[in-house]
From Swiss-Prot:
The gene is snap25a. This is Synaptosomal-associated protein 25-A. GO terms for biological process: synaptic vesicle fusion to presynaptic active zone membrane; synaptic vesicle priming. The keyword Lyase does not apply. Residues 19-81, 138-200 form the t-SNARE coiled-coil homology domain. InterPro entries: SNAP-25_dom, SNAP-25_N_SNARE_chord, T_SNARE_dom. GO terms for cellular component: cytoplasm; membrane; neuron projection; plasma membrane; presynapse; SNARE complex; synaptobrevin 2-SNAP-25-syntaxin-1a-complexin I complex. Keywords: Cell membrane, Coiled coil, Membrane, Repeat, Synapse, Synaptosome. It is found in: Synapse, Synaptosome; Cell membrane. It comes from the Eukaryota. GO terms for molecular function: SNAP receptor activity; syntaxin-1 binding; voltage-gated potassium channel activity.
Length: 204
């Protein structure tokens, strides 16, 4: 009888320990899910900010291109004015290129496209039969499995977000380099045009 009582007590202790471990494991998966969801939200906000920054850079580069177009018109007008004033032989008539290489192709050489979503290893585990080895086989383990499945899916999406961010940052860095070249080119041409106009007015 004493041995039976001891065995029952041992089984009861084991059951309590199993319940405790199940509760702790469940809370752990809940925390994991919360953390990856927060990371996902942060990733989405970052992608949105990068997209908005990309739009701003597009507007800035379009402004540089418009200044370049306007400067071509201004340079033509100065040439016509120089001919009219008989200043064709004046050295200041010869406008420099102003960094013509800056006005090449605006393309970054990267095709903007969304990468195809693939099933990663964690998702494959969920598809093939779950993430955990069942002990209590109750609702807690069902929730653990569901939580881990969601965690695996979100981690896969975070990986794709990171790739998208890296590609967008590379694209924007190249665009910033182009904008800097165009800004330098425009400044040089504006300075030259101002000097030329000043000499013309001084000769007039």
């Amino acid at each position: 009888m004493a041995e039976d009582a001891d065995m029952r007590n041992e089984l009861s202790d084991m059951q309590q320990r199993a319940d405790q471990l199940a509760d702790e494991s469940l809370e752990s998966t809940r925390r994991m899910l919360q953390l990856v969801e927060e990371s996902k939200d942060a990733g989405i906000r970052t992608l949105v900010m990068l997209d908005e920054q990309g739009e701003q850079l597009e507007r800035i580069e379009e402004g540089m291109d418009q200044i370049n177009k306007d400067m071509k018109d201004a340079e033509k007008n100065l040439n016509d004015l120089g001919k009219f004033c008989g200043l064709c032989s004046c050295p200041c008539n010869k406008m420099k290129s102003g960094g013509s290489k800056a006005w090449g192709n605006n393309q970054d050489g990267v095709v903007a496209s969304q990468p195809a979503r693939v099933v990663d290893e964690r998702e494959q585990m969920a598809i093939s039969g779950g993430f955990i080895r069942r002990v209590t086989d109750d609702a807690r383990e069902n929730e653990m499995d569901e939580n881990l499945e969601q965690v695996g899916g979100i981690i896969g999406n975070l990986r794709h977000m990171a790739l998208d961010m890296g590609n967008e940052i590379d694209t924007q860095n190249r665009q910033i380099d182009r904008i800097m070249e165009k800004a330098d080119s425009n400044k040089t041409r504006i300075d030259e045009a101002n000097q030329r106009a000043t000499k013309m007015l001084g000769s007039g």
